[in-house]
Amino acid sequence: MALCRSLVVFAIVALMAPSISLATDFVVGDDAGWGLGIYYDVWAQGKQFFVGDNLVFQYTAGAHSVYKVTGDEFRNCTVPSNSSLGSFSGNDTIKLATAGNKWYICGVNGHCDGGQKLKITVLDGGAPAPAPVAPGPYSTF
């Protein structure tokens, strides 16, 4: 009887507990990192980016940079004139704080035109919640 009550309590707690979503760190370009000759549109296909996730740009410092830009700046490969808007460390983490389209380019001359740019769509909320745990066949309410 105590086991049945424990199972019922566990099932109720499992059903009532909010889903826990953990942030995901996405290394842009995976092992290739952030550089020339990588198709970032292909890299982003099939990935779901959620608010709270992180983009990690890994590259040789001084060889590349990362700028978060507008859609027009992305399409035209326009680097913002304010260099304080860029990241240059070679290991830059950008938290995805809001939902919507996000655009990133390399600010080194010719790199964006050469394909070093990334467009993603960030979704609101976390990953889907796991299915609730059903009580065992011998439990009663």
Put a short name on every predicted segment.
Residues 3, 19-27, 44, 50-54, ...:
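Plant P/S/T-rich low-complexity glycomodules
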Residues 5-21:
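Cleavable N-terminal signal peptides of Sec/SRP-targeted secreted and luminal proteins
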Residues 26-37:
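Short N-terminal segments immediately surrounding and downstream of signal-peptide cleavage
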Residues 32-34, 46, 57:
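Cross-kingdom Sec-pathway N-terminal secretion signals
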Residues 38-44:
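Short alpha-helix capping/helix-loop boundary micro-motifs
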Residues 54, 59-60:
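Short, surface-exposed secondary-structure boundary micro-motifs
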Residues 62-71:
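Short, Lys/Arg- and Gly-enriched loop/turn segments at beta-strand edges
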